[in-house]
Amino acid sequence: MMPLLDEPPTIQAVLDRSALQSYARGHIHVGELLIDVADGGAVIAVPTVALMDAYAQSLGNKHATALLSLIITLPGIAVMDLDAKAASGAAKKVPWSKGDLSRSHAVWAAKAHNAYYLTTEPAEVVDLLPPGQIHVIPHEDA
């Protein structure tokens, strides 16, 4: 049997809204991780609800919205649509994420793909994911 040529890449990590906002502020941490993950042949997922939330938090900041528009075009990034399966799965996380739909979608994605959860707000997900799955992005730039 011939191997599939277009197998989907492995999702190694998921960016939440706070990690996307860190990138939109021009912090280097997310970009460095993106290079490492892409060099390994995997991708970092951007859940659409987290992306929408990051855009909403950046309204009026043209630089931040430009960086958000850029990151989703980069090699090594996979935008995760909110399809029926994701909506159903993410909805089950809403009660534990204090009603945060963006966080719920990102947590669901990390669990569904056994991927690292990249965040600047680890305290918000400490009860939702095992500690080894949470990767803290520094809130301040290096």
Predicted segments with their positions:
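Short active-site oxyanion
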Residues: G40-I44, P75-A78, K111-Y116
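Short, well-structured N-terminal submotif of metal-dependent ribonuclease cores
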Residues: M1-V46, A56-I72, D141-A142
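Short, hinge-like loop/turn segments at secondary-structure boundaries
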Residues: N61-T65, S97, I134-I137
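Alpha-helix capping/helix-boundary segments
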Residues: A19-L20, A50, A86, H105-A106, ...
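Amphipathic alpha-helical segments within well-ordered protein domains
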Residues: M52-Y55, A91
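Acidic catalytic patch
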Residues: T73-S97
